[in-house]
């Protein structure tokens, strides 16, 4: 006889089966993408995915089309600026940051065109899986993470604005020139633009909006990775509860191992399908965050290690640095490190949870060890269920330790230069 969780699928409506599912998990972040002008999918305000449509023939195109055009223009400006002034780490950093934002925007556009097929493929599998327990609790957790990442994005915007406005006032605005404050700010924060084009307030405001879009976009990518990691972990935990419940069943009511094997195969397919469509975003998320961490480490250690000696006082007395610079760099560095650790730890739980059934399978009595249990054991052991970055790396606890070790090695090398 099938386990109760499997039998409960019978007579359950499609709406109930999809509660706490893939679409409900990612719907709110996608709505945010829609609002900031980079996602051409309509119908996201509905709780059902059947209303989702990719369309450029709508009022929304008035927002989306200029956004893409402006991003493309800024990418070309960044590339020209980099070669016109013979490179430089600041120009290279700005180019890498904008390329990450631009790449995500293009990936979102191409993904939007296939969205209806993707959501149909995923929900087809979800309808064959046992209904998730505590779906309301899972959705509440999802909303909490979305809120936290959105607040983090706004905090990052405010922190950058406060820092750049302060530096503009200190370095680029002379006494009696308060009327040129806004112009000085735009020239200081967007040198790659006004070194090659005449000054324009309109252009400055547009580029500032694009910059805010980039901050929110990159943070929401991290948010989506976290949310889908939680969703897949919940799916695997629910499966693990079914498997471990087998040990407490009597012989006549125990589920057949072949059913558990088939169920694990379905969940494996779900993980692999989601990873196939998500892994470019995972790759961009990690490369963007790690490149920023390395750049900040280089800047901090370069300032602190004059004459191969760490002198914080000299760092603070530098005419181009003050305590606000140190505070800004330290806060931004700490926030990005915390964000990377949060994303990595939660995403690594997918792989860790997928290995849990082995604890039971390795301790089965001889009477229970059959060809089906052996097949399930082999499948669990060799199935690398985890999120990946374009299959270049898989997010596991081992990968997290390796990443930390690499950053520490990078820091030691910088200290020795």
Language-model-detected regions and their locations in the chain:
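Membrane-cytosol interface segments
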Residues: 2, 17-18, 22-31, 97-120
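Terminal membrane-anchoring module of integral membrane proteins
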Residues: 2-67, 143-153, 157-162, 253-417
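Helix-loop-helix junctions within predominantly alpha-helical proteins
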Residues: 62, 68-92, 97, 129-221, ...
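Generic structural signal for well-ordered, non-membrane alpha-helices
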Residues: 74, 100, 120-127, 234-241, ...
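Inner-leaflet juxtamembrane helices
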Residues: 105-126, 226-236, 337-364
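Short intracellular "coupling" helices and adjacent cytoplasmic loop segments at the cytosolic face
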Residues: 107-112, 131, 135, 244-257, ...
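Short, contiguous, pocket-lining structural segments
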Residues: 201-212, 216-235, 252-259, 279-282, ...
């Amino acid at each position: 006889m099938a386990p109760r969780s499997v039998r409960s699928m019978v007579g359950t409506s499609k709406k109930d089966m999809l509660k706490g599912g893939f679409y409900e998990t990612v719907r709110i972040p996608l709505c945010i993408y829609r609002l900031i002008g980079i996602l051409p999918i309509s119908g996201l305000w509905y709780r059902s995915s059947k209303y989702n449509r990719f369309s450029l023939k709508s009022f929304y195109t008035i927002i989306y089309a200029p956004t893409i055009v402006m991003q493309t223009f800024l990418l070309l400006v960044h590339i020209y600026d980099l070669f016109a002034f013979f490179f430089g780490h600041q120009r290279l950093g700005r180019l890498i940051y904008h390329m990450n934002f631009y790449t995500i925007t293009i990936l979102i556009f191409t993904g939007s065109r296939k969205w209806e097929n993707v959501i149909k493929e995923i929900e087809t599998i979800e309808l064959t899986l046992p209904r998730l327990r505590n779906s309301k609790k899972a959705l509440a957790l999802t909303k909490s993470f979305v809120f936290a990442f959105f607040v983090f994005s706004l905090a990052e915007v405010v922190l950058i604005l406060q820092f750049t406005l302060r530096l503009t006032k200190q370095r680029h605005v002379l006494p009696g020139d308060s009327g040129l404050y806004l112009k000085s700010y735009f020239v200081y924060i967007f040198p790659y633009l006004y070194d090659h084009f005449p000054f324009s307030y309109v252009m400055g405001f547009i580029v500032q909006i694009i910059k805010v879009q980039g901050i929110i976009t990159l943070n929401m990518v991290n948010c989506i990775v976290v949310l889908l990691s939680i969703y897949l972990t919940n799916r695997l935990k629910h499966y693990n509860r079914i498997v471990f419940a087998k040990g407490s069943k009597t012989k006549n009511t125990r589920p057949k191992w072949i059913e558990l094997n088939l169920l694990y195969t379905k969940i494996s397919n779900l993980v692999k399908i989601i990873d196939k469509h998500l892994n470019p975003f995972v790759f961009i998320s990690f490369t963007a965050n790690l490149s920023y961490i390395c750049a900040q480490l280089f800047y901090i250690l370069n300032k602190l290690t004059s004459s191969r000696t760490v002198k914080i006082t000299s760092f603070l007395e530098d005419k181009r640095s003050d305590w606000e610079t140190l505070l800004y760099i330290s806060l931004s560095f700490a926030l990005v490190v915390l964000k990377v650790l949060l994303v990595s730890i939660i995403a690594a739980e997918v792989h860790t949870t997928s290995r849990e059934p082995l604890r039971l399978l390795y301790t089965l009595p001889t009477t229970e060890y059959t060809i089906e249990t052996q097949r399930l054991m082999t499948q669990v052991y060799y199935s690398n269920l985890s999120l990946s970055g374009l299959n270049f790396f898989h997010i596991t606890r081992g990968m997290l330790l390796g990443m930390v070790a690499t950053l520490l090695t990078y820091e030691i090398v910088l200290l020795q230069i």
